[in-house]
Protein backbone atom coordinates (compact mmCIF):
# COMPACT_ATOMS: atom_id res chain seq x y z
CA UNK A 1 0.00 0.00 0.00
CA UNK A 2 2.83 2.40 0.81
CA UNK A 3 4.26 2.00 -2.69
CA UNK A 4 0.91 2.94 -4.21
CA UNK A 5 0.64 5.92 -1.88
CA UNK A 6 4.12 7.13 -2.87
CA UNK A 7 3.27 6.80 -6.57
CA UNK A 8 0.03 8.72 -6.02
CA UNK A 9 1.82 11.53 -4.15
CA UNK A 10 4.54 11.65 -6.82
CA UNK A 11 1.90 11.87 -9.54
CA UNK A 12 0.12 14.69 -7.69
CA UNK A 13 3.34 16.69 -7.26
CA UNK A 14 4.33 16.10 -10.89
CA UNK A 15 0.92 17.28 -12.08
CA UNK A 16 1.16 20.44 -9.97
CA UNK A 17 4.71 21.12 -11.18
CA UNK A 18 3.71 20.74 -14.84
CA UNK A 19 0.71 23.00 -14.29
CA UNK A 20 2.89 25.71 -12.72
CA UNK A 21 5.55 25.44 -15.44
CA UNK A 22 2.88 25.58 -18.15
CA UNK A 23 1.57 28.75 -16.51
CA UNK A 24 -1.98 27.46 -16.52
CA UNK A 25 -4.26 28.36 -13.61
CA UNK A 26 -4.89 25.43 -11.27
CA UNK A 27 -8.51 24.30 -11.45
CA UNK A 28 -10.09 24.34 -7.96
CA UNK A 29 -12.01 21.20 -8.91
CA UNK A 30 -8.72 19.42 -9.60
CA UNK A 31 -7.35 20.45 -6.21
CA UNK A 32 -10.55 19.26 -4.53
CA UNK A 33 -10.30 15.90 -6.29
CA UNK A 34 -6.66 15.53 -5.22
CA UNK A 35 -7.43 16.46 -1.62
CA UNK A 36 -10.48 14.21 -1.64
CA UNK A 37 -8.33 11.23 -2.58
Curated annotation (Swiss-Prot):
> This protein is called what?
U12-myrmicitoxin-Mri1a
Q: Which species is the source of this protein?
A: Manica rubida (European giant red ant)
Q: Which domain of life is it from?
A: Eukaryota
Q: Which GO terms describe its molecular function?
A: toxin activity
Provide the Gene Ontology terms for cellular component: extracellular region
What the protein does comes down to: Toxin that induces mild paralysis, and reduces survival and reproduction when injected into aphids (A.pisum). May affect various processes in the aphid, including wound healing and hemolymph coagulation. It does not increase the sensitivity of the aphids to the chemical insecticides imidacloprid, methomyl and Spirotetramat. Has no insecticidal activity when injected into blowfly (L.caesar). Does not display any antibacterial or antifungal activity.
Propeptide stretches in the record: 24-25
> Between which residues do disulfide bridges form?
none
Q: What is the lineage of its organism?
A: Eukaryota, Metazoa, Ecdysozoa, Arthropoda, Hexapoda
Sites where Valine amide occurs are at 35
Tissue-level expression reads: Expressed by the venom gland.
Instruction: Name its cellular compartments.
Output: Secreted
Q: Which residues form the signal peptide?
A: 1-23
